[in-house]
Amino acid sequence: MKNVVIVDCIRTPMGRSKNGVFRYTRAEDLSAHLMKGLLKRNPSVDPNDIEDIYWGCVQQTLEQGFNIARNSALLAGLPQSIAATTVNRLCGSSMQALHDASRAIMVGDAEICIIGGVEHMGHVPMNHGVDFHSGLSKSVAKASGMMGLTAEMLGKMHGISREQQDAFALASHQKAHKATIEGYFDSEILPIEGHDENGVLTLVTHDEVIRPETTLEGLAALRPAFDPANGTVTAGSSSALSDGASAMLVMSEEKANELGLPIRAKVRSMAVSGCDPSIMGYGPVPATKKALKRAGLSLDDIELFELNEAFAAQSLPCIKDLGLLDVMDEKVNLNGGAIALGHPLGCSGSRIATTLINNMERTGAKLGVATMCIGLGQGIATVFERP
């Protein structure tokens, strides 16, 4: 089996979904920009040697329909010989894209792949056209398809208070703002044109979604968003709605060495797992444990974790049961997470992996885990190792 390595990883800035910088920019344009960007940043890679593109996207309709991976590749002017497929594991779609490409490379079916994902939640809302089968109600409660209520359930099961959620949300914005000011995101963001609040074309270089003005008092004043009578989850402690894309250049270790490309990280192991849909946010716990077992590692071996923050009420139980509460500030989401940056569904998997790899390089960490929950009860995790 061949070793799989990441030689480059980038993302767009995260744009606010409601009247944000990408309101006139289509999902295919966000995607094509990154595909072209990876090749421009790595001129030693012959595009004709790329086997396949795996691109995550959840709402595959409207501008994101009819295989957005292929549409974006053609829009980017990539060789027509490069195949492309769109991957959907809901929130874990672009991490699944990485897993699919990695397996193809491991068994020799590919040497070089582009992976990534996109979601334009401003143009294609999360619930657009969704029609659940009525028969699901025999085994799954209707509320299991309502992500906010699953977060409420998970938070109550683990005794997570409103105050803990608000503090976690505040920290996400503070860390993301600090990362922006300190330039920690500069190595992963590929600037792209968008439009400012006046509709003027502008170069977007930073995330639009972060709210540095957030305070505990402001968060405490928000009403519960999903369970008005007894809830604790608010818009402020939930992942923001944002638009964005992310991408990675993935290849065999042999090919990277042949091309003289720096190996930024190796895919050490991968895993997915299912869990009760009513507590879908718990998926990272079994997925992470499974991935670590496959890598022959323990939780103590991992120096950095990147956990997608769907909700504070969902993140904190996962952090608790992974034994990370006491080291959360030093090990988990150093640059904040989706509460501050947003969660463009198909983009997030490779986005958090990209942020993890950049943080591993910045801090000198050798081993890291990127993991996320997935709607309707799944989790996905990837263990990365720096050379």
Curated annotation (Swiss-Prot):
Domain of life: Bacteria
InterPro entries in the cross-refs: FadA (IPR012805), Thiolase (IPR002155), Thiolase-like (IPR016039), Thiolase-like_sf_Thiolase (IPR050215), Thiolase_acyl_enz_int_AS (IPR020615), Thiolase_AS (IPR020610), Thiolase_C (IPR020617), Thiolase_CS (IPR020613)
One Gene Ontology MF term: acetyl-CoA C-acyltransferase activity
Annotated signal sequence range: none
E.C. code: 2.3.1.16
Catalytic activity: an acyl-CoA + acetyl-CoA = a 3-oxoacyl-CoA + CoA
Pathway the protein contributes to: Lipid metabolism; fatty acid beta-oxidation
Catalytic residue list: 91, 343, 373
UniProt keywords, alphabetically: Acyltransferase, Cytoplasm, Fatty acid metabolism, Lipid degradation, Lipid metabolism, Transferase
Assigned GO CC terms: cytoplasm
One of the GO biological process terms: phenylacetate catabolic process
Residue ranges the record marks as coiled coil: none
NCBIfam families named in the record: AcCoA-C-Actrans (TIGR01930), fadA (TIGR02445), PRK08947.1 (NF006510)
Annotated family: Belongs to the thiolase-like superfamily. Thiolase family.
The protein's assembly and partners: Heterotetramer of two alpha chains (FadB) and two beta chains (FadA).
Name of the protein: 3-ketoacyl-CoA thiolase
Originating species: Aliivibrio fischeri (strain MJ11)
Lineage, top ranks: Bacteria, Pseudomonadati, Pseudomonadota, Gammaproteobacteria, Vibrionales
